[in-house]
Structure formats: structure tokens, C-alpha cells
Amino acid sequence: MAEADRPGKLFIGGLNTETSEKVLEAYFSKFGRISEVLLMKDRETNKSRGFAFVTYENPGDAKDAAREMNGKPLDGKPIKVEQATKPQFETSGRRGPPPPRSRGPSRGLRGSRGGPSGMRGPPSREPFFKGMSSRGPPPMKRGPPERNGGPPPKRSAPSGPMGRPSRDRDPYGPPPRRDSLMSRRDDGPPHRDDHYGSKDSYSSRDYMSSRDSRDYGPPPRDYPYREYSGHSSSRDDYGSGSRGYSDRDGYGGGREPRGYIDRPSAGSYRDPYDGYGNSRSAPPSRGPPPSYSGSGGSSRYDDYGSSSRDGYGSRDSYPSSRSDPYSTNRGDRPGRQERGPPPLERGYPREYSSSSRGAPRGGGRGGRRPDRGMGRNRY
């Protein structure tokens, strides 16, 4: 396959590293006249690489030398003698492949070049695998995070719509309800929706005791109906107390006792509210329940609590238990007491006077309250 070099040129391989060009020339000159002897040496070390080229002037002499000297020992080593091929093919075919092979393995085996290359190879592979592993796991980590992140986003996406809406429902849902309640309470008739209004007015009374009587609507609206339960008992106390009042104060014929006794629906709650007013002011308070939410609770509380205690104290059936829930709960709730006082004079001042309560209210403090109530009702 390799193309033969010029005729008369022989390749001599397997030489001893100690063999020199002079020895080769003396050994091969007996077959003919030699034009050139070329011993291949290492460039760095200048030592023989183990092969050489001998060129005869007559190609026939080269054939004779190859035939006779091939496999014969020279300096203790058998040598190989054959027709030389062209240098490019020699480098690629014979010398070439061995050098690359020798270079490849030698470099691979050598610590200097091969080691680094080998080290570079495996380390590069290791970093590669590490990079793959690190990158891979990070992708996997990213994958899982993406999976985790992805699914959780999916989860958060559903949960976001669900959870966030739920959150939105929690913060925003009740406020709209409050707003709706506020709007309802802002409207005249919605004040009649005091199944909320009443409850909120309770909570508003608790919270509004410290506020001015002018914060009528909004304060009750600000506080949801969550604390209605605690005040429902107070309603019951009011209702029961008002029932007792209505029964004993001669309200039996009035509309309010029925409201207290029946109380089937929200309207009945309105009635108990009205009844609360009516325990003081009977039916007139029914009409404008909204005015419940606004009054100075403390002053009313003092007047009302003291008067109520004065009025109720005389009765055995109305011990401090009646007067206390009435006074304390009413004290915290500034709202309805204004309604109470104005209706007091409007509604049943005389009936009140007939009752034990009437005396202190009609005589001493009753007169002052309408003034206060009227002054504040202006707002």
C-alpha cells in the first residue's frame, strides 16, 4: 500500500541504540556503493531511535542487500531490511503511527505531558461528570425545585387562587359584608336590618363607649357581628329584663312586650332593641333605631345606670343583676341611650313615673336627659 521510495533506498529497523552511521556504512558497503547513510536520532537527546536509511547508487545492489541482510544480527540485535517507502508514508505508516502511538501512550503514560493530558482527560471527565452531576443534580435539584416549585406553583396556583381567594375572602369578604352592613345602616330602612345592625350596635356599644356620640353609624359598622354571641346574652338579659319591666311596669298592653316575648325573627330583634329603648321609652324608639348608635355613653351611662339602679333598686324583682347588665351593658353601649331619653318623655314619662323608675327619671334626671338627648340628636 505504501508507495516505495526512490529505488535503491533501504529501511533498516531494529537497530541497537549504540550502532552508529559508520558501522552501518561499513556493514552494508560490501553489497555495493552507498550514496547516503541516514541514522534517525532523537532531536532532544540526540540518541539513535533504532532505525536508519541506506541508499545505494544502484537499485540492484539495494535488492541484494535487503535479501541478504534482512533478519541478520547487528551489534547483538537482529535487524529488519526492506525497501524504503516515501517519507510521508513512513511517518504515517511506520514511523508515523508508532510515534503517534508512542506519543499517545507515551504522553498518556508520561507524567509531564501524558499525565497532564491523562489527568486532564479524566479530571475533565470527572469535572464533566461532576459538572454533569452537579449540573445534573442542580438541574435535578432545579428539576425538583422546578418540580417542587412547579407543582407547588401548581399547588400554589390552585392554592393561590384557592388560598389567596380564601385569604381575600377572609380579609375582604367580611369587610364587604361590613360595608354592605354599613351601606345598609346608612340607608334608613337598612337600620331596620338590625339583626345585623343590632348585633353590630352591641359590639359598637362595647367599642363605642369611649368614642363620641357622633360616631353613630360607622363605629357599629366597623365592628363585625362576631361578638354578637357575647351580647346575645345581654340581649336576653335585656329582653328578659324588658319583659319583666313591661310586665311589671304596665306595658302589657303595649306593642313592645309582645316583641320581647315573641321575638321570632330579626324583626323581633328590632323589637327587643326597640324594647330596650322602650324599657325606658316604649314604642317611639321603634321608628328610628339608627339613632341608637350615637350617644355619649359615659354620661348616659352615669345617668342611666344611676337612675336605673335608683329606679330598679326599689323593686325586689329587679336586683343588681337586672340593673347591672342593664347599666353595665348600656354603659358600654353609648348608642341607644339617647334614643331612650328622648322617647322617655315622648313615650311613657307618665307610665314611668307611675313605676318606681319613673320617679327619679321624671323628677330629677329625666328632665335633663331630654335636653342632652335633644342636643346630641341634632348631630
Curated annotation (Swiss-Prot):
Region (Disordered): 57-379
Keywords noted in UniProt: Developmental protein, mRNA processing, mRNA splicing, Nucleus, Ribonucleoprotein, RNA-binding, Spliceosome, Transcription
Xref: PROSITE patterns: RRM
GO cellular component: catalytic step 2 spliceosome; euchromatin; extracellular exosome; nucleus; supraspliceosomal complex
Keyword presence, RNA-binding: yes
Compartments it resides in: Nucleus
InterPro entries in the cross-refs: Nucleotide-bd_a/b_plait_sf, RBD_domain_sf, RBM, RRM_dom, RRM_dom_euk
Biased composition (Low complexity): 304-327
Name used for this protein in its record: RNA-binding motif protein, X chromosome
Organism whose genome encodes this protein: Danio rerio
Top-level taxonomy: Eukaryota, Metazoa, Chordata, Craniata, Vertebrata
Gene that produces this protein: rbmx
